[in-house]
Amino acid sequence: IIGRLVGSEMCIRDRPLLYYALSNLIRAGVREVLFISQKKDISKFRKLFGSGKQLNMKFSYTFQKKQVGIPDAINIAKKFINKKPFVLALADNLFIGKSFTSTLKKVQSVKEGAAVLAVKTKYPSKSAVIEYDRQKNIKSIIEKPKNPKSNLTIPGLYFYDKDSISVVKNLKPSKRKELEIVDVHQSYLRKNLLKVFELKKDVQWFDTGDAEEMLEASNYIHKYQKKEKKLFGSIEMDSYLNGWITRKQLRTLINQMPNSKYKEKLSALA
C-alpha cells in the first residue's frame, strides 16, 4: 500500500517520485499494490501505472475522502488487506543503499504483530523517536519530541499483520483531530508485538516532504547512480531483475516510453 497525499507530477531527477517508493516494494517482492491518494490524483496515477499487468503485478487505486491521519489508510484498505500481512509505505520517503533490500526481506519474515525500521538521523525531533532500555528492548516511542532521548527515528515504511485493522478501529484522534501512526505502534508495543529493524550505515533515508531534503535526495541519487553504474528507482528494471518480466518485455516497455533521459538510461542498461 502506498498511502500519502503525493501528486503524480512530483519528480526527483528524471522520473516521478512514486517510482522510488514502488521500486522499493518491488525489490522486496511485493506484487499487489493499492495506491491511496487524493481523489483528483487517482486518474493521473492510473495513467502513469495502469493495471500493473505490464510488470506482471496488480495495481488498484482508491482515495482518502478526508485527511484524518495516516492510519486511515488501513481503514480504507480493509478489503485489499484481506486478513494478510501488508506494507504501508509513505510515497515521499526514499531509501537508498545496497543493504536496504536484504533488510526488507528480513522484516517480511515477521508474520505476527508489527515491524518498523529505525534509522539514525541528525534531526530526530522531526519524526517518531525510539528509546531502548539497557537490554536493548524498546522502552518508548515518542512522536517529534522536543528533547529526543536517542537519534533513532522511524521512517515511513511500516509492516503490519491483519490485527492492525482492529487496532486502528480503536484509536482515538489526537489533539490535531487526526489518527496518529505512532499510536498504532504503541498499541503493538504494549502487547510486546512490535519489532524494530535498524537500517545499516550504507542506507540513506530522505523525507522528501521537506523541500530541502528533496534537493538532497536528488543530488544523492545522481552521485549514487554515477558511482554504482546502476539505475535507482526503476520499476521496469527491478521487475526484470526479479524475473517478473522478460528482457523482451522490458525492451517493449522502453520502446513505448516518450523520449526522456530516463528512457536513455534504461535503454543503455537493457
Question: Which residue stretches match the model-derived regions?
Answer:
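Single conserved hydrophobic/aromatic residue that forms the stacking wall/gate
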Residues: 1-7, 12
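Conserved N-terminal catalytic core of the sugar/cofactor nucleotidyltransferase
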Residues: 15-104, 210, 252, 256, ...
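Structural beta-sheet core signal
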Residues: 34-35, 88, 114-117, 196
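A short acidic, often aromatic-flanked loop/helix-cap motif at beta-alpha or helix-coil junctions
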Residues: 66-70, 123-125, 147, 204-205
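Catalytic-core segments of class I nucleotidyltransferases/pyrophosphorylases
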Residues: 87, 101, 108, 137-244, ...
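Short acidic/polar capping segments at secondary-structure boundaries
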Residues: 92-95, 119-123, 135-136, 146-147, ...
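Conserved donor-nucleotide/metal-binding helix-loop-beta segment in metal-dependent transferases, i.e.
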Residues: 97-125
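A structural signal for short hydrophobic beta-strand segments in well-ordered beta-sheet cores
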Residues: 130-132
